[in-house]
Amino acid sequence: VQRRVSPPIFAPPGAKTSPNWAIRLYEAADEVAWAAKLNVFWILFTLAGGVLFGVGPATVAAYTLARRRAMGESFRSWPEFVSAYRREFVRGSVLVLPLAAVIGLLVTNYHAFPALRLPIAVALGFLVVIAAYALPMAVHYDLRTPRLFPKASLFALTRPASSVLLLFVFTAVVFVSTTFPFLVLVLAVGGWIQLDTWLCLRFFAENEAKLHAKGIS
């Protein structure tokens, strides 16, 4: 991504500067409100599918809108979420349900077998990172579902710093959510999806720039 940097402009002594803090505060509040809206949509449509058949398409639909938001698009959130939910109903279930099942099994074993907690925690962390890459990949690239997990795994292994950052952010979200459980209903899921998407789009752009510099398309 190319950025143009303008020459610095210095205000004369005594001149009033623009209230940048107010603008930043507004932008931060707008992002929190958006994450809360995304959270509500995710919960409603997960429940609409009876949880089991709703969580997959609701998750992929949320990532679809999060990507569009991160790329600066303007859209009507409710009809676009409904459209994405219907469009991704089958693929979302195929993508998310196996991930949720394996993560649930690992969490159960983590609590059931104290002696194996370290290897289980490592496996759980790696799977979380793979999911954190795979879901944004699913809505950003034209990839078939069977290719998503190998691609996400390779990306996780070749970009360790980015993977550690994603795992840190996810752990922070989980910690805050367990400390304040009401956030799960208000903000946690939508906030994580938007943060994950925002970070991954930048990781993808950096990777594409490196490949382009090497002459690899």
Describe the role of every protein-language-model region.
Residues 1-120, 128-178, 182-217:
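Helix-coil boundary and N-terminal low-complexity module in membrane systems
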